[in-house]
Amino acid sequence: MLWYCRFKWLHHTTRQQVAQRVIEQHQAGGGRRPASLKGWYNLAGGGAGFLLVETDDPRELTATLQPFMDVVSFDVHAVYAVDYDQRIQELQQMVQQGH
C-alpha cells in the first residue's frame, strides 16, 4: 500500500533541528535510503512537503514517522495510482448510462 504523508514543520522548529533529525535517522538506518521511502518532495518556500511511503503494515509506517513527530506534524492518507485512460473510459461510460 502506498501512503501519502504530508508534513509541516511545527511552529518553533528550526532548519538545524530538521537536518539533525534526518541525519540521525539516516545513520540509524545504516546510511541507506529506507526501502519503503518511494519519494520525498518539498513544497516551494520550505517548511512543508510530503513523503510517499510504501508498506502494507501501518505499524511500520508509524515506526517510520514517529522519530520526526516532535519537529513536524503529519497528515497521512492511503493512496493508489489511477490509470488515466482507463478512468476516462469508465467515466465516459458512467455519463452515457446516466449514473
Each model region followed by its residue ranges:
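Conserved, structured core segments of small domains
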Residues: 1-99
